[in-house]
């Protein structure tokens, strides 16, 4: 595979920090409803998959206020470090990737959605962030393309947005300039372990020796570790995007990113196009693009931005995120195998937490 072909290049392009994990009260109800709704924010096609159902069982067990609080104690300060890491990398490496420091809007079209968004903003504020509640009128003053359906929203100033593929390509170039060897299209078959220590990798192009290995292979990390008897609570969570060119018949020109709260869809300006990205689908390890899931992105975007034209998208994509059952990234050394570390389970925060993880 190529640099940026996965979720690291196809994501919504937002550095969103300070938010609670997906594990929250009420998720069980949403999971049950998702079994029938192919156009909802969450979709789980009914099928027999014991690993998935065990993962969902554990996920629901973590849907408590106490767990959210424990996660926030870790993730809130980590988010501030992530922002600083991005600002430093972009400036020091002079990376051109459409970096916007104006934050993003979370906008709502229903009263329950607005109440929920305001409650979340209040919780985030308690951890040192500065969300701003905004009326519908002021939202439309700031962004004239917003629909009259909007009832209000939140501005999260401590966030960033960028074109993730351009960011990755620039990082790849800088790394190679510093002597890093990056092999594309290579498949890792297994790890070579001798006397409890990792000594390399077996690939489809031969063996690669190593003194240390960092396993950062997203949702595929679980399968690689499973071969050596280590279990990770991971499931692949499929996300989608549609990109629309800005112009007549296409996407409106918007100033900064926004999240359509009820639909969980991000709208991010990326130069001459706007990316509509989101959804969560648990359907296993596949890259099958379901038309109803893609249509959900467009339908949600059109409700928020009635100026979205009838021209087709310039590109469509889906990719797999590594979803941990407790909503927390899995980072650190593997106790039973010397020289082996893992960095996965970032869920929908892979872009956000990538630099600070490194």
Task: Mark where each language-model region is.
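Glycine-rich FAD pyrophosphate-binding loop
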Residues: 1-10
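Active-site substrate-recognition segment that forms the wall
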Residues: 11-14, 19, 23-62, 189-200, ...
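Short beta-strand to alpha-helix junction loop
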Residues: 70-83, 106-116, 141-142, 154-174, ...
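Surface-exposed helix-capping loop/turn segments at secondary-structure junctions
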Residues: 88-100, 177-181, 230-231, 305-312
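C-terminal lid/capping helical subdomain adjacent to the catalytic/cofactor pocket in oxidative enzymes
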Residues: 133, 193-195, 328-357
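Short loop/edge segments at beta-strand edges and connector loops
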Residues: 135, 184-186, 315-317
